């Protein structure tokens, strides 16, 4: 209660407001130079007309408007469907309550096959968890250096994937061998490998990219197009 989120909306020039567009939902705001990439892909016809929603993690402010708590880990690293529920019931309805600069209604497809979610680090695991618990909302997931470590239970997800019938979700996972290590939480790169192995075992449609990068979106941005 009381948590505030800032978000930005990307509307491609090709959007006519007459039928629902696909959705790209980006965590931690605009990453990977996404609007520029989307402009290029939509114009070339390699990507359907897609509205981008870029959300910052929540903050709580005092009566003077000063931030007194950052809620990123509590929202993004949790391993249940809470944040996905917020996307469905709070964020997307707020987005669709707006109009474009030229007065068009913002219409977003309800088909999960038309929806992708992405993020890096804690945003990466949040993307995975949102689709995992709510495949009716998202069926495309793009993650880089995801925090699948022992922070808030993310380390248990690969075992859950192996033990559960596969769902209609497609995944892209990227990480680098120089990703961060923590003596309590573990090694980010190793847990990304474990997650990819579990998804492959369970029969998911999966694409991976491994390099020698660190805990950064630099290489993930390179791969994004």
Indicate where each model-derived feature is located.
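Non-catalytic cap/lid and distal C-terminal segments of serine-dependent acyl enzymes
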Residues: 1-225
